[in-house]
């Protein structure tokens, strides 16, 4: 009798669990179901605070890394759903309440508006005349310019896109549920970094850029070419016609073969010159629109796509070829770094806080870089001459960057407290940084003191000399010059270098560094930004505030686990008010407290940056251009002589430019006047939480409870004063909200009036 061997089944790695967590609305309806203590319900009013503090702190729900990973993954889909709903709302406003088509016909004469206020009790005053007979609120998001660059020519297309956004949101909500409750990935899937890198680089960034490049070439470029030539939007063929009908493209770009297969042959045979009509290397700005050449940006996205698709094939997965991240990290040893990056692979695959800290620091820095590039090289048509939008985009990306960087430090400190394992990090870079943290922090402290006294001292000197009537003894372009020679050298270098490094480019990347004035519709789009003593001085204020922010945040991370004062700090957790009773002088030392203090300095820092930008641009860049080429700036170049004293900043910037928001009542800008007042109030309200003692409120509450008891209306849930940390959290939140909204109202009322 012969026994046949069992059929060999191909081995398949199972990377999901089926139906791991039941879908229970009954469970979700119970507040605090994720925490045993909270689930019992409220005994005191502290319960509602803890409910909010812990709802998304998945580390406290379970210690199982796989379950935590799944919750984070699922939450990402929920976040994306919210983003799609929000974007859909933006597009819907563009479709239903905007003057987009009128703006498209006359982008220099008509202002963008996508919101019309209902006149319930006289709010109709807010609907200002934005041109072309349309009355609404002027928007400063830059969406109109983005839509034009995308090739959107009518409001129906916006409507369709808005519906598409809702469909995507629904898909994301489904995915978030499906990947937690039905098919949940195993931990090894989350830790498979090579596969993740390949997919994110080649798929998300590579194919994403390729898809956008394809859209730009086949839809954006032909439509924008026709718009620039003065063809009415309603006479331009619809996007799909350019894709399906090659003869339309052949009319606009005759020297290219637009055949379905023959069109891509030059790409793979390296005959790239065939595409030079629409994949250009012009450099500089399009003189018609004041934006980057869309043919340059299409070229850029195609190049980026090629690079990232290659990058997405570099990491070792199923075929045993390519890089292994663990090997790269463990081989990375410098002459002074001991065991180098050994152990970091384990850190970054088991601590999502460590991963998030790096990502937040990188994304925050990137957002700040985006802010700088948006005005120097405006990417969309007619963006550069829309001054309110330019100011808003700069301010927005600076604030976002600041918050993300602080978030990076916050999660760095949480990683140190919750996830750091000293035994796994022996003499590697992380361990060595922690061992010489005193040297790092004391040096940083010295730098902060030096920068603070010297930068502020220059201003104090100038205020004093001006008060004494001795202008020749002031630091200024006409007195004692402190020219930013290195910055001027960099500007000059960047103006000249492309001639050698990019000989085929027609112009340098940005005229901010040097070149001719680019004017659109009689307004300055961009021109060389001349730097002088005033810029040198405020630059050192920037250096000072950045270094203080870094000092606070880095100290919080490096001393999160222990310090000479509290050697066992790691046992107290990420946030604790004091190590007491019985140990004086140990308050405000937790990782959380450093984030709290860091937020205030981040706010200081970004405020000075956006004030500098706003005034510098109004003084030296933005303005009107006469037919003979003379430029009249909004504030007539007063930055160089006024921004060199503290009094100048107070009088000629804050006070002089606040006149529009203060005098906005009775005009379409009156909402900004109300916001200006209201946000000051919110800011002042924050001080009540920041300068208060917990015991004071607890005593007050107890006497109020006594009165309620007398009247037999005592509450079942015992009222409690906010804890020290809750009070600080409420305080810093209102401080930032009030400060940012005040700045927003101040900036917009000003720039909409004069821009």
Swiss-Prot record:
Binding site residues for [4Fe-4S] cluster:
578, 587
Q: Name the family the entry cites.
A: Belongs to the PsaA/PsaB family.
> What organism, scientifically named, is this protein from?
Thermosynechococcus vestitus (strain NIES-2133 / IAM M-273 / BP-1)
Question: One GO biological process from the UniProt record?
Answer: photosynthesis
A family per Pfam = PsaA_PsaB
Membrane side Cytoplasmic: which residues? 1-64, 180-192, 312-352, 419-436, 559-590, 691-723
Annotated TM spans: 65-96, 156-179, 193-217, 294-311, 353-376, 387-418, 437-468, 533-558, 591-619, 669-690, 724-753
Quaternary structure (record): The PsaA/B heterodimer binds the P700 chlorophyll special pair and subsequent electron acceptors. PSI consists of a core antenna complex that captures photons, and an electron transfer chain that converts photonic excitation into a charge separation. The cyanobacterial PSI reaction center is composed of one copy each of PsaA,B,C,D,E,F,I,J,K,L,M and X, and forms trimeric complexes.
Enzyme Commission identifier(s): 1.97.1.12
**Cofactor binding note of this UniProt entry:** PSI electron transfer chain: 5 chlorophyll a, 1 chlorophyll a', 2 phylloquinones and 3 4Fe-4S clusters. PSI core antenna: 90 chlorophyll a, 22 carotenoids, 3 phospholipids and 1 galactolipid. P700 is a chlorophyll a/chlorophyll a' dimer, A0 is one or more chlorophyll a, A1 is one or both phylloquinones and FX is a shared 4Fe-4S iron-sulfur center.
Q: Name one GO cellular component term.
A: plasma membrane-derived thylakoid membrane
Name of the protein:
Photosystem I P700 chlorophyll a apoprotein A1
Residues annotated as binding chlorophyll a': 680
